[in-house]
Structure formats: structure tokens, C-alpha cells
């Protein structure tokens, strides 16, 4: 019951709010760049997987965006780096 009241008063937990905000952002990007939200999410997950092999990153703060300007689309990524991993052959 308290959960319902908190949601009605706009006090839903930050996790749900962040997830909803991310989903909305993906939908808006889809509209601007004609790319499905699933495609952009898969791209983001693949970037995280590859970068994680070389660096320690803050996945919570990672932002991947498509910017559409006139006749071009740019992939813009803001990836906070916590540290670098040592190469296996060093």
C-alpha cells in the first residue's frame, strides 16, 4: 500500500526512475536517428563488453548517444574510466 502511495506522490525509487529515463532517452534517440532502441542498447552492451577488457569503467555513468545533424549521424560516448588493466603480455 505504501508503495502505491509513494508512486502517486512521485516518490518512486531512484532505480525505477533511472531505468524509465534511460528507456525514454533510447526512444528519443530512435526517433532522431531511425535506429531501434534495441539496436542502440545492444551497441551499448557490446561497447561495454569490449572496453571492459582493457579498462575499468563506471558502467552506471556511461552514456552512449546518437546525434543527428542535418545529413550525418554521430555516435557519441561518454565513458568514465576508473583505471586501466595490465596487458597479459607485460
Curated annotation (Swiss-Prot):
InterPro entries: MinE (IPR005527), MinE_sf (IPR036707). Keywords: Cell cycle, Cell division. Signal peptide: none annotated. Gene3D superfamilies: Cell division topological specificity factor MinE. GO terms for biological process: cell division; regulation of division septum assembly. Belongs to the MinE family. Prevents the cell division inhibition by proteins MinC and MinD at internal division sites while permitting inhibition at polar sites. This ensures cell division at the proper site by restricting the formation of a division septum at the midpoint of the long axis of the cell. This is Cell division topological specificity factor 2. It comes from Syntrophomonas wolfei subsp. wolfei (strain DSM 2245B / Goettingen). The gene is minE2.
Amino acid at each position: 500500500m505504501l508503495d502505491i502511495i509513494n508512486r502517486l506522490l512521485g516518490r518512486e525509487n531512484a532505480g525505477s526512475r533511472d531505468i524509465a529515463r534511460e528507456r525514454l532517452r533510447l526512444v528519443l534517440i530512435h526517433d532522431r536517428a531511425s535506429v531501434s532502441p534495441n539496436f542502440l542498447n545492444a551497441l551499448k552492451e557490446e561497447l561495454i563488453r569490449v572496453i571492459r577488457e582493457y579498462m575499468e569503467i563506471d558502467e552506471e555513468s556511461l552514456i552512449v548517444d546518437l546525434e543527428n545533424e542535418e545529413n550525418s549521424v554521430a555516435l557519441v560516448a561518454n565513458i568514465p574510466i576508473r583505471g586501466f588493466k595490465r596487458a597479459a603480455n607485460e
